[in-house]
Amino acid sequence: MNLEVKKIDTANARLSAKPSIENLEKRYDKIAQKIAQKVKIDGFRRGKVPLSLVKTRYQAQIEQDAQEEMIQEVLKNAFKELGIENKDLIGSPNLTKFEKKDTHFEIEADIGLKPTIVLDKIKECVPSVGVEIPNEEKINERLKQLAKDYAKFVDTDAQRKAQNDDKLTIDFEGFIDNAPFEGGKAENFNLILGSKQMLEDFEKALLGMQAGEEKEFPLIFPSGYHAEHLAGKEALFKVKLHQIQVREALEINDELAKIVLANEENATLKLLKERVEGQLFLENKARLYNEELKEKLIENLDEKIVFDLPKTIIEQEMDLLFRNALYSMQAEEVKSLQESQEKAKEKRESFRNDATKSVKITFIIDALAKEEKIGVHDNEVFQTLYYEAMMTGQNPENLIEQYRKNNMLAAVKMAMIEDRVLAYLLDKNLPKEQQEILEKMRPNAQKTQAG
């Protein structure tokens, strides 16, 4: 077969082979026989179709199957010479050359191998961490917000004019070009003015209305509105206000603590303050990590953890980044790239550094996650996407299905694992007293979030 293999480094190998034409042709009869057992041709019983007829009718398929079989044999022999197995591979080998000559084929392929990653310098990569401890002023602000959020809405006098923070019960219907539109109508709809639950201009139009009042007003949907069929269009809304309710103020005392910490025995204002302080600490930590330290940690990992990267995976990542970039390009730029192979190649090459860094960090994170037994369940991925859908006004099931169809669920899971691994490394580098705050707060992290 005239096979040559070369181990370039610990993560890359290359093969070159020249199998003969006979090597391919000897496979034809066996493949044709397999096809003959399955196909149905008029005038012949299944399995009784003459081989000559099968070869004529299915020539292209036989040729393709024979080539694939021959390539797999080449790869199998190459793996044997390299002393590797399928479990050592990362991704599929990349066929870079397949040419038919007079007497043989010329085949070349790049083989990506799972890299060897040494994590002995991880501690050097983690930046120093110091989270701001919430002061009394911040704690009191959050207590006031909790008192507001947990306050009940009660009826008010009929003469009251609607103000921000009032709870309104309304009927509304929207029209575009005198015709109602999908999603533009609701009855007995509850809305807290100023909450940005609806478009800002919609809520502003309700200010000053009284119970029983009806009103019509124009509204232009923003050009970037999530419902594309409404984006940039002018609508006329008809609204009837049924009821106005106001918050019944709560005192900041032990009674408030019992409401907020309903699952705690003997909840007191002192305990609530401790919980609020811990929650604010977690929020400060998340802000510091997301805005500064995670990126710094990634840069350090990229710089200090050195190992060979499989070229095949970098090339795949470059393709992905290039394709994604096309979606955000102007039509003229896309056309320019389509018309010039050289420009397209140059543009794709511009993503090499980003692709290399992305692949490297992914391998490091994967190794750390396995070492520290950090993972993400599929249900957590679905919960994350469900929350994203709710925040962007999309149908959760449709969004999840969209991610599934585009094979993006694995990428979401990997991003979540990366976030957890980075947070884990940074948490370990917190001062001892802050680690104690964090440990104390873990079971209670969700209890005192405002809203």
From Swiss-Prot:
Family to which the UniProt record says this protein belongs: Belongs to the FKBP-type PPIase family. Tig subfamily.
Encoding gene, per UniProt annotation: tig
EC number(s) from the headed UniProt entry: 5.2.1.8
Organism, as annotated: Helicobacter pylori (strain P12)
GO cellular component: cytoplasm
Official protein name in the record: Trigger factor
Catalytic activity: [protein]-peptidylproline (omega=180) = [protein]-peptidylproline (omega=0)
Record InterPro entries: PPIase_dom_sf (IPR046357), PPIase_FKBP_dom (IPR001179), Trig_fac (IPR005215), Trigger_fac_C (IPR008880), Trigger_fac_C_sf (IPR037041), Trigger_fac_ribosome-bd_bac (IPR008881), Trigger_fac_ribosome-bd_sf (IPR036611), Trigger_fact/SurA_dom_sf (IPR027304)
Lineage: Bacteria, Pseudomonadati, Campylobacterota, Epsilonproteobacteria, Campylobacterales
Assigned keywords, A-Z: Cell cycle, Cell division, Chaperone, Cytoplasm, Isomerase, Rotamase
Function: Involved in protein export. Acts as a chaperone by maintaining the newly synthesized protein in an open conformation. Functions as a peptidyl-prolyl cis-trans isomerase.
Enzyme class: isomerase
